[in-house]
Amino acid sequence: MIFDKDDFKAYDADLWNAIAKEEERQQNNIELIASENVVSKAVMAAQGSILTNKYAEGYPGRRYYGGTDVVDVVETLAIERAKEIFGAKFANVQPHSGSQANCAAYMSLIEPGDTVMGMDLASGGHLTHGAPVSFSGQTYNFVSYSVDPETELLDFDAILKQAQEVKPKLIVAGASAYSQIIDFSKFREIADAVGAKLMVDMAHIAGLVAAGLHPSPVPYAHITTTTTHKTLRGPRGGLILTNDEELAKKINSAIFPGIQGGPLXHVVAAKAVSFKEVLDPAFKEYAANVIKNSKAMADVFLQDPDFRIISGGTENHLFLVDVTKVVENGKVAQNLLDEVNITLNKNSIPYESLSPFKTSGIRIGAAAITARGFGEEESRKVAELIIKTLKNSENEAVLEEVRSAVKELTDAFLLYED
């Protein structure tokens, strides 16, 4: 809008070429990282807008700087749209990330040193749910709950028993690698039974919740956090929701001046655009297709005895696959697939025996390929290509066949139409 592509290329060819290479990579790769997606041109336009110039510490109507009338309109649009999407009374759209949203939620609910229960990383939790290397594990006394070792599903009886023993002040629900439906009402029952608050991190499933395809945590959680990317298809950022006015005040204070200064007004604008897209009926169709494509890929793996899907299948946008019968570990699988232009990540599985740098599994997500237009047929083909690659890792002729098949798919489904 202000600085066009030709100007950019002429001014900084090195940076322009790097960005162009990334655009080429995204166009020519099949993206299966579950936390990634493809945003609209409108989202990118908003994020690259002149709003990046404006500082606006505070909140709409209560800023510390002048000249904020326009950014007040922008932020209010984002807030009201977020509230409408999720049926929440209060929304804070300023968090720069999901991790910062979680940090602010903790600050609003508990004190340093308090006992908290969160899902352990290998069972599908997130670093900010109490991992020792995270601020969460270093600030609070986290006690991890796990999935059932046999079913690899959440065991609410076991979680209740554990909660009765450790008496947490807060229970954190939500996951970054759990492929089944989460019953948030049961988590609230457990929290109430032990006098704890409930916080839900729905970062991965927020788009499915928004589309009505996964139960919403908002009626049950004291605070709900999410990212605005992943299945929501917005810019990288965070969002906090609550129905409690007093908690809303604490959340606002925790974000600013607690852990952030001025909001990124251009990112808030991009969030507002993406929220408008979520409110469009077409988004529900997109989210439904994400689940269909995830199931289609999982079904291919379920038919091959050399692979094992954690928990036996998927009901959302992702699933985990134990690859150790075919290759040494998840890291090896990730690297092999990189060579044929299929991008995903190694991932720990429940009761993991390998280090987080190797892992027994890989995580596969359908959000980005669905955004490109892949359907169930293409998704099954992708799963077949993954299996073909991992089972023929030493056969360059087969790997070249896979590369050609990947190129056919990416050429047929462009990242962006010109």
Curated annotation (Swiss-Prot):
Domain of life of the source: Bacteria
Gene3D superfamilies assigned to the protein according to its UniProt record, in alphabetical order: Aspartate Aminotransferase, domain 1 (3.90.1150.10), Type I PLP-dependent aspartate aminotransferase-like (Major domain) (3.40.640.10)
GO molecular function, one term: pyridoxal phosphate binding
Cofactor(s) required, per the database record: pyridoxal 5'-phosphate
Enzyme Commission number(s) of this protein: 2.1.2.1
BP term (GO), one: tetrahydrofolate interconversion
UniProt KW keywords: Amino-acid biosynthesis, Cytoplasm, One-carbon metabolism, Pyridoxal phosphate, Transferase
Binding site for (6S)-5,6,7,8-tetrahydrofolate: L121, G125, H126, L127, E246, S355, P356, F357
SUPFAM superfamilies according to UniProt: PLP-dependent transferases (SSF53383)
Transmembrane segments: none
Chain coiled-coil ranges: none
Pathway(s): One-carbon metabolism; tetrahydrofolate interconversion; Amino-acid biosynthesis; glycine biosynthesis; glycine from L-serine: step 1/1
Catalytic activity: (6R)-5,10-methylene-5,6,7,8-tetrahydrofolate + glycine + H2O = (6S)-5,6,7,8-tetrahydrofolate + L-serine
HAMAP family named among the record's database cross-references: SHMT
Assembly, per entry: Homodimer.
NCBIfam families: PRK00011.1
Protein name, entry field: Serine hydroxymethyltransferase
Protein species of origin: Streptococcus pneumoniae serotype 19F (strain G54)
